[in-house]
Swiss-Prot record:
Protein name as catalogued: Probable GTP-binding protein EngB
InterPro entries: G_ENGB_dom (IPR030393), GTP-bd (IPR006073), GTP-bd_ribosome_bio_YsxC (IPR019987), P-loop_NTPase (IPR027417)
Residue ranges occupied by any EngB-type G domain in the UniProt entry: 26-200
Family: Belongs to the TRAFAC class TrmE-Era-EngA-EngB-Septin-like GTPase superfamily. EngB GTPase family.
GO molecular function: GTP binding; metal ion binding
PROSITE patterns reported for this sequence: G_ENGB
Species lineage: Bacteria, Pseudomonadati, Pseudomonadota, Gammaproteobacteria, Vibrionales
């Protein structure tokens, strides 16, 4: 028996100002991170087929909370605050750079990192730093090049190949694909990657379900 994830059932659990205020470090967490204005909230909404799961902001970079969502039993998405926005004070930027590093290094339940980048402006300094931290911690990374609908097919494919070549320099497990919350490009790819990362927890849940099934009676 297998347990299938229904991403449309994903729901908000809590917000936290830093990792110390997150719920207990257990289960499997997949973190979503990206520069402000990369369409992270829209990507989460498209992934889950919900319009308002992650609230989009007209003032990027102002929301400095970690948002936790439950996908299934023991499976969570952690929406990390956007980084790198010009209007955010330097002190706040530095604080979040430290917090991101701490989260990647210390959160035992973190089993995968999705880094969202605008396909037209990928691999900025903080994007690269985030990937370096993840690779150093042995965390697999899925780079999603958002707003892929902004480029024509040929240019989109060329950009994906270019970023994949750049990603090879980091070593580790770093995949790169195009994504568009508007047209749906890459949604199935992202869900398949999350399924892969959540698989150990899903297998444990399936085993638990089988163990709870009543034994068939052998009485005549």
């Amino acid at each position: 028996m297998s347990v299938k994830i229904h991403y449309q059932n994903t729901h908000f659990i809590t917000s936290a100002p830093d990792i110390r205020h997150l719920p207990e470090d257990e289960g499997i967490e997949i973190a979503f991170a990206g520069r402000s204005n990369t369409g992270k909230s829209s990507s989460l909404n498209r992934l889950t087929n919900q319009k308002n799961l992650a609230k989009t902001s007209k003032t990027p970079g102002r929301t400095q909370l970690i948002n936790l969502f439950k996908v299934a039993d023991g499976c969570h998405i952690v929406d990390l605050p956007g980084y790198g926005f010009a209007q955010v004070p330097l002190e706040m930027k530095l604080k979040w750079q430290r917090a991101l590093g701490e989260y990647l290094q210390k959160r035992q339940s973190l089993k995968g990192l999705v880094v969202l980048m605008d396909i037209r402006h990928p691999m900025k300094d903080l994007d690269q730093q985030l990937i370096i931290w993840a690779v150093e911690c042995g965390i697999p990374v899925q780079v999603m090049l958002t707003k892929a609908d902004k480029l024509k097919s040929g240019a989109r494919k060329a950009q994906v190949l270019k970023v994949r070549e750049e990603a090879k320099t980091f070593g580790g497990d770093v995949a790169v694909d195009a994504f568009s919350s508007l047209s749906g490009i890459g949604v199935d790819t992202l869900r398949a990657k999350l399924d892969e990362w959540y698989a150990p927890m899903l297998a444990a849940l399936a085993e638990q379900e089988e163990g709870e099934q009543p034994e068939s009676s052998t009485d005549q």
